[in-house]
Amino acid sequence: MRNLMIAFALTFAVACNNQTETQEETAHDDGSTHVMEADTRTAMSTDPDFTIESAAHQQLLRDFYTAYINLKEGLVAADNQRTDRAAKEMRTIITDASFNELEGEAHDHIAQMGRDVIRMVEHSDVEEQRNYLNSLSTSLFTMLKAGDIQTEAYLQHCPMAFDNQGAYWVSDKEEIRNPYYGDRMLKCGSVRETL
């Protein structure tokens, strides 16, 4: 029995992994929930095992990032027309033949971004589009790091999104403007990484 108790205690200690968070989170509970689908990247790494050196690919990445920022701001404002326009622009960029020449992990991220963007185009409702933002954002941030595109990018995190599972987005400004909750919880989140 004693061995069983020790084994249980060790298992519990390892499972809990008592890590402390270094960033301060600003969180507010407004009672609303989001349904998370098609995205399981809550614990992720944005460290690429590749680089994007081609000037043409870097320009496509800059263009995609600009359209992404428009999408993100549309989600913050809950503006369906703005998010639809941005998602369609992102789809045009992501399907560029030269962008899809990338191989390995870079190709995997481009493919994931493409799937997320296509889903956003298919679902013009802002709430539906938010379901694909986390996956899109983590892949985009990895690509931005690999591309070294010389622009500011902040990986930000909302701990409250999707029933407290948390979710990421990328911003061109350090200021928190939460695209998952918009004006309901505009300042909920923290900067996790900066380029």
Region locations from a protein language model:
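Sec-dependent bacterial lipoprotein signal peptides
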Residues: M1-V14
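Bacterial signal peptide processing site
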Residues: C16-T20
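Post-signal peptide N-terminal segment of mature Sec-exported envelope proteins
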Residues: E24-I52
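Mature extracytoplasmic or organellar-lumen-exposed domains after removal of signal/transit peptides
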Residues: S45-D49, E53-L195
